[in-house]
């Protein structure tokens, strides 16, 4: 996970001070950086503290992920739902975010420069060798960005779904905050 030391990973040593603020979606304290006393480092978790972000920049981490996927495919599973898949690639310079000016933090947390490289590699190394189905959860992705995940010629994922469509019945989320466009049927 993000405490791996090899390649300028997604962690910060205590001596470097607290990393730039990042909001955690599920952490009650709100901060996506969690201090780990034994390593004297912070690790990143955009969701629960028990879900450290993996460092997809590290090829050894990706190889381990592919081994795990192959293990389950060899056991006979028919496919995978890839939760919050846009978050696997991020800007690891972690620029300061003016939350008043940019309340939508999604672009800072996800859709990083190598996202589609990682997905194509995962397809090439694992999914293309099995008769399986892949479904990515792509909340807040635009239709144009969403197509990049599933376009057949890109060889990444089979399907992508968006919670915005699933939550259309919820009047408090009736409009897409990313685009300001009202939903209608």
Regions found by a protein language model. Give the residues of each.
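Conserved alpha/beta catalytic core and glycan-binding cleft of carbohydrate-active enzymes
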Residues: 9-22, 119, 123-185
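Short N-terminal secondary-structure initiator segments
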Residues: 5, 26-50, 138-160
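Active-site-proximal cap/lid insertion segments
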Residues: 38-40, 84, 100-111, 170-180
């Amino acid at each position: 996970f993000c405490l791996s030391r090899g390649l300028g990973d997604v962690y910060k040593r205590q001596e470097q001070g607290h990393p730039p603020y990042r909001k955690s979606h599920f952490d009650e304290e709100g901060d996506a950086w969690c201090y780990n006393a034994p390593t004297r480092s912070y690790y990143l978790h955009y969701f629960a503290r028990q879900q450290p972000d993996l460092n997809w920049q590290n090829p050894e981490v990706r190889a381990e992920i592919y081994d795990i996927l192959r293990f389950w495919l060899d056991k006979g599973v028919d496919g995978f739902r890839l939760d919050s898949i846009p978050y696997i690639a991020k800007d690891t310079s972690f620029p300061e975010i003016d939350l008043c000016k940019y309340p939508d933090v999604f672009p800072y947390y996800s859709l990083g420069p190598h996202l589609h490289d990682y997905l194509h590699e995962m397809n090439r190394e694992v999914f293309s060798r099995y008769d399986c189905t892949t479904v990515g959860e792509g909340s807040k992705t635009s239709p144009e960005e969403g197509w990049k995940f599933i376009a057949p010629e890109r060889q990444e994922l089979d399907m992508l779904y968006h919670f915005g469509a699933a939550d259309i019945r919820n009047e408090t989320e009736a409009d897409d905050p990313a685009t300001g466009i009202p939903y209608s049927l």
